[in-house]
């Protein structure tokens, strides 16, 4: 599954624009107000019908997705919505190479041309017959994510029954409800304890879904290990720096964000493709959309997060947005999409640049404040 091209008309700030994406990592870069978030929203909207077919939900095009212009006449202002609204995706989703959502007017429902529903019906029948079908991950992480726990009890988690299609729950806003995230982690901890009782094993080495999720976390933070649920404390815990155990909710925003992002993607993959076993993170394809990739992250982690995502989930197409020079400098030019007045282009060079060079070469920002630059220029002129 991948998105190769997206054509949008009258979507938020875009009148008519087309964007091309790489199969691997894509980072959208632009000044505030240039349309970064709107583009990521359009990418997510292009998959609404797929997500709804996988896990029925009340997600559809909204009025705020429709571009409007302000008409002024005799001192009065009118806000006029612009139609048609079009979101046209091209790529590869099961057997579909093109899919479209369109709305021709305010009184018209949105029209869909995708064939996703028919394809998903076939897949459901195959799964019911125990056929091993690979399901792609699809999830959108918005910029307002905080990853605060919700306090799910072990009792409720033990009663929870998971379907493969639960991997798509809340895909359109992955951090809106963390109860599924917590419930799964608690359930897997209880499952591990039950297996130890059944086998009378005393081993502390595990090769289960919880271990695979922790493997993804270690790609992000090498010294972070063993995210699990503690029955006595009734809390999620994680080991940081070998001998330091911290409750998940007491991690810094940056630590919690890194741990939860990698854990949630891995968790969804484990739910979607249990037949893949220990190779599930390496083999699961899909599209993951992340707004403000650098949010709450220390510059060192900003530099390492893209390589870590690529290593942990090599088959996934990432479409993300960021203003971080450290992240931009960790990517090749073809992986960076620079937005300027609604137009997209690739920078001449990015990979390996220091942050100051990225600011100047890619983001068109001076390395120093203008007043300082002027003083330095005068100083050098005097020295000469």
Locations of regions flagged by a protein language model:
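P-loop NTPase switch/coupling surface
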Residues: 1-180, 378
């Amino acid at each position: 599954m991948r998105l190769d091209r997206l054509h949008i008309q009258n979507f938020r700030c875009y009148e008519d624009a087309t964007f091309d994406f790489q199969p691997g990592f894509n980072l959208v870069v632009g000044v505030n107000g240039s349309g970064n978030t709107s583009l990521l929203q359009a990418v997510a909207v292009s998959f609404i019908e797929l997500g709804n077919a996988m896990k029925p939900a009340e997600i559809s095009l909204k009025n705020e997705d429709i571009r409007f212009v302000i008409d002024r006449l005799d001192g009065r202002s009118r806000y006029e919505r612009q139609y048609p609204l079009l979101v046209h995706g091209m790529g590869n989703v099961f057997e579909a190479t093109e899919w479209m959502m369109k709305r021709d007017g305010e009184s018209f429902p949105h029209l869909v041309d995708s064939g996703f529903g028919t394809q998903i019906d076939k897949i459901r029948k195959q799964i019911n017959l125990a056929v091993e079908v690979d399901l792609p991950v699809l999830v959108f992480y918005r910029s307002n994510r905080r990853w605060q726990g919700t306090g799910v009890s072990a009792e409720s988690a033990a009663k929870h029954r998971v379907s493969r299609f639960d991997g798509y729950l809340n895909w359109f806003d992955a951090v809106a409800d963390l109860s599924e995230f917590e419930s799964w982690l608690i359930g897997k901890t209880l499952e591990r304890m039950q297996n130890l009782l059944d086998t009378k094993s005393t081993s502390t080495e595990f090769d289960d879904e919880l271990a695979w999720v922790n493997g993804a976390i270690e790609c992000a933070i090498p010294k972070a290990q063993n995210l699990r649920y503690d029955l006595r404390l009734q809390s999620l815990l994680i080991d940081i720096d070998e001998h330091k155990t911290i409750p998940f909710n007491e991690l810094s925003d940056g630590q919690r964000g890194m741990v939860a992002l990698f854990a949630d993607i891995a968790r969804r993959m484990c739910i979607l493709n249990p037949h893949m076993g220990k190779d599930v993170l390496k083999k699961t394809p899909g599209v993951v959309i992340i707004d403000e990739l650098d949010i709450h992250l220390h510059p060192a982690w900003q530099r390492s997060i893209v390589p870590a995502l690529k290593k942990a989930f090599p088959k996934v197409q990432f479409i993300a947005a960021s203003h971080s020079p450290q992240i931009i400098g960790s990517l090749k030019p073809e992986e960076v999409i620079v937005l300027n007045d609604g137009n997209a282009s690739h920078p001449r060079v990015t990979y390996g640049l220091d942050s100051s060079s990225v600011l100047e070469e890619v983001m068109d920002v001076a390395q120093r404040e203008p007043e300082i630059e002027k003083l330095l220029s005068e100083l050098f002129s005097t020295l000469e």
